[in-house]
């Protein structure tokens, strides 16, 4: 909130349960099911990938429970920053918040780049006017312009008011679900169970494990619900936060399981893992028509819009919160007097997204791996804070389960020798983010 000589200026209170679900689920499920389906299946096979997402997602339910309890007690946009500040030092509180900002923010330029790639797939003429190459990958002017245009649109929406942003999120989230049901329902009528083979690409344990490693990245978002906690309507019932968080996780698990099963069912997936946008290709092969590809790509674009917007909302609220608490420059805690939005934080996220777009997907894709660890750090810290607060014994047990899950998800990515562990690029990206955070903290 912001004080002036006449009144207290707070964030606008206009969000309902359906808005929080659209935010949580919409922030979680992006376009990975189209862009990197080949990677998921090569990691685990059809059954390995389904089990990886199902088990990994189920392990997030205790963490979702803890978030539901914390936001009910502390409906603060600071989220993990506020929770850890209750029981830990300001340094730990800031470090946790800074990691969570990375988890949300890194998705924004990734999605901005992805929309250009999808547009280029639909209209090949857009794969032209190469500006430069990074790590051997071209950066095209039309792709940049499309991504910058979308970034500008979402910046304006979020600057202008949370109700505009929430309406956009609802339409894109439920539109994604409707089109998803359409293409899956039609496509599977043409498939065969014989196409599932092989069920695992490695041993069953390794297959499931390799997929579970990436679950934190592809299921980050349910906790974005708490970042909008201060913007609930005055009549909002506090239990609505818990419902939205759990619904987001459960629907997310079902979405990933269904789309993986559908891709494995409709065509012999093993023969098509080299194809760009494999999900669209397998459905086109099964149906024998391009119309289903257009439906899938439209679904992906809507999904991209919602996950971009959801992460934009969450990142800007956290940046606003650390500014309001004086952990970085306090000007970031400014609330627009008319729009009642964290306007300066919104502008910073928009500008940073636009700048990072110029790195291209060659840099952004490996850097995005850091987001999964950043998310797990936030989950671990939130559960540890809840445990330290001292709830009843059974709730402390759930919190400890959340701590263990968060810790294991971190270790799966950073311990050398474990398949899929951090490369030098990921460590470099994480180190740079830490340096930026320390610089902002020391100059606050």
What are these regions (language model features)?
Residues 33-40, 157-163, 192, 328, ...:
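Transmembrane helix-loop junctions in multi-pass membrane proteins
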Residues 82-85, 89, 121-126, 244-309, ...:
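TM-loop-TM module centered on a large, flexible mid-protein loop between adjacent transmembrane helices
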Residues 39-42, 51-52, 61-151, 156-159, ...:
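Hydrophobic transmembrane alpha-helices that form the core helical bundles
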Residues 142-190, 202-205, 245, 249, ...:
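Membrane-interface loop-to-helix entry segments
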Residues 370-372, 387-388, 393-444:
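A generic transmembrane alpha-helix motif of multi-pass inner-membrane proteins
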Residues 11, 71, 95, 149-172, ...:
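Membrane-water interface regions at transmembrane-helix termini and the short interhelical loops
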Residues 1-47, 60-65, 76-77, 235, ...:
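Membrane-interface "cap" regions at the ends of multi-pass membrane proteins
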Residues 3-11, 50, 126-144, 170-297:
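Helix-loop-helix junctions that connect adjacent transmembrane segments
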């Amino acid at each position: 909130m912001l004080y002036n000589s006449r009144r207290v200026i707070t964030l606008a209170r206009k969000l309902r349960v359906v808005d929080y679900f659209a935010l949580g689920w919409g922030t979680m499920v992006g376009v990975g099911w189209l862009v990197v389906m080949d990677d998921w299946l090569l990691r685990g096979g059809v059954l390995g990938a389904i089990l990886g997402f199902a088990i990994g997602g189920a392990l997030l339910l205790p963490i979702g429970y803890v978030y539901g309890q914390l936001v009910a007690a502390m409906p603060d946009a600071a989220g993990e920053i506020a929770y850890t500040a209750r029981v830990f030092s300001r340094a730990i509180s800031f470090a946790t918040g800074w990691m969570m900002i990375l988890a949300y923010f890194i998705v924004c330029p990734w999605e901005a780049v992805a929309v250009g790639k999808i547009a280029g797939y639909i209209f090949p003429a857009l794969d032209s006017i190469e500006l430069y190459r990074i790590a051997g990958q071209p950066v095209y002017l039309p792709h940049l312009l499309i991504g910058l245009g979308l970034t500008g649109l979402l910046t304006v929406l979020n600057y202008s008011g949370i109700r505009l942003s929430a309406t956009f999120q609802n339409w894109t989230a439920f539109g994604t679900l409707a089109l998803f049901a359409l293409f899956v329902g039609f496509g599977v009528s043409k498939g065969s169970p014989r196409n599932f083979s092989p069920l695992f690409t490695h041993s069953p344990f390794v297959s499931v494990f390799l997929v579970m490693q990436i679950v934190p990245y592809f299921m980050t978002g349910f906790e974005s619900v708490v970042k909008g906690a201060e913007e609930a309507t005055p009549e909002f019932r506090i239990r609505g936060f818990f419902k939205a968080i759990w619904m987001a996780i459960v629907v997310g698990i079902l979405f990933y399981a269904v789309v993986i099963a559908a891709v494995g069912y409709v065509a012999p997936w093993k023969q098509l893992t080299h194809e760009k946008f494999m999900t669209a290709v397998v459905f086109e092969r099964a149906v024998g028509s391009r119309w289903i590809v257009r439906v899938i790509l439209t679904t992906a674009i809507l999904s991209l819009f919602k996950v971009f917007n959801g992460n934009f909302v969450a990142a800007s609220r956290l940046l606003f919160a650390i500014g309001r608490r004086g952990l970085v420059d306090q000007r970031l805690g400014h609330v627009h007097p008319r729009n009642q939005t964290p306007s300066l934080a919104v502008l910073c996220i928009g500008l940073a997204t636009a700048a990072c777009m110029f790195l291209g997907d060659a840099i952004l894709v490996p850097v995005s791996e850091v987001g999964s660890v950043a998310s797990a750090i936030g989950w671990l810290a939130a559960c540890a804070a809840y445990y330290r607060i001292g709830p009843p014994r059974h709730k402390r047990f759930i919190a400890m389960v959340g701590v263990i899950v968060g810790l294991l998800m971190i270790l799966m990515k950073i311990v050398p020798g474990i398949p899929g562990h951090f490369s030098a690029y990921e460590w470099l990206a994480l180190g740079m983010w830490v340096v930026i955070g320390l610089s902002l903290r020391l100059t606050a």
